[in-house]
Amino acid sequence: MTGTFLVTATPFICGNTVKGSVHVDNVTGTPEFTIGDPNSPNFGCPGNTITGSLHMSHSSVFAVESNTIGGSVLLDADTLELNGNISNGSLMCSDGTVILPGEPGDPTGNTVHGKNTCS
């Protein structure tokens, strides 16, 4: 995939290279939406390479795990599992973003090369 990837419905992004950024806006629901989650109890979803940034706004019930993100991760009023990712930019949480614990066996924490306001 090349360019900015705008998500407004249920995304399952597994094992892909996104040449650009991913934007997830106002997406909520069940089952859990997934942007990488190799240890999911329902199905394995390999992590992704996102060359740009990951932006999430007002979205919930997400797993974002084991991805390599070339830019920053910007989270605004979201609820999600966020584990085992590598961000070459910053990890920024705002407006009450909630980071949920992952399932047993999930990696813990994220590697962030810039500022981290989510801890």
PLM feature spans:
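Short, solvent-exposed linear patches
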Residues: 28-29, 59
